[in-house]
């Protein structure tokens, strides 16, 4: 039993992460917690005598090392139960009953995850939670009730943030936090040919605050794109430092939040090569941006000046605005 969520979070923190999100259940339907409603969970395995709770371990590790915990819930697919793109297999009354049952199951699982682990930073529904008036469960009221300060991502009615349109770790330039809709994906956006451009750039005239995030797996180099561990993986799949810095500048540097996927190996640990690269990355971010030569601020000014005591070589300018009241 080498699984160590402390090691996961320490690796993320070394890169400069401020929050971490755990995939609590994905497309198989298997849950990484002690579920009372989903028997396909850690209760069903011999590991830790069937009493393990990786969600709890993860949340505890986040709080121990000062990262905000979030939970990722995959309900769009469930291979065990025959759910494909939210839809239960089959036709007729039997399929309709299974659909209704699956929606209630999802709501109960979300209730468990929202009520057992204290305050959460984000609830992330992979592929969304769809339309509660259609195939999707009605999860938004559950999150609102039990996690009122939590970021919600997402269903057809609401997205507190938006995907940046690719899994490249970058967004477009410019990238506005404002958006024309309070959601990022819905039936109204299906088939819109330039929707990915809208996701990548936002809309300066948008009425809704839906900031962008850029995501990518750390093991996305050399022809790979691995969100999960793959047999035969090696350090050649890990992005080089220069690629990661380019992503940082084209995501964080363009007004987006960068989210990087880490995958434990079969022993339950982040591989040594990944840990080393994350530490290198955090060090390089600090080297470039951690100690500015000078800084200034101003309000309602068209020009700002910075004066040095002696000539200085400057290779970066970092410009930010106060976004507490919008852009």
Q: Predicted segment positions?
A:
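Mature catalytic domains of secreted/periplasmic carbohydrate-active enzymes
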Residues: 1-327
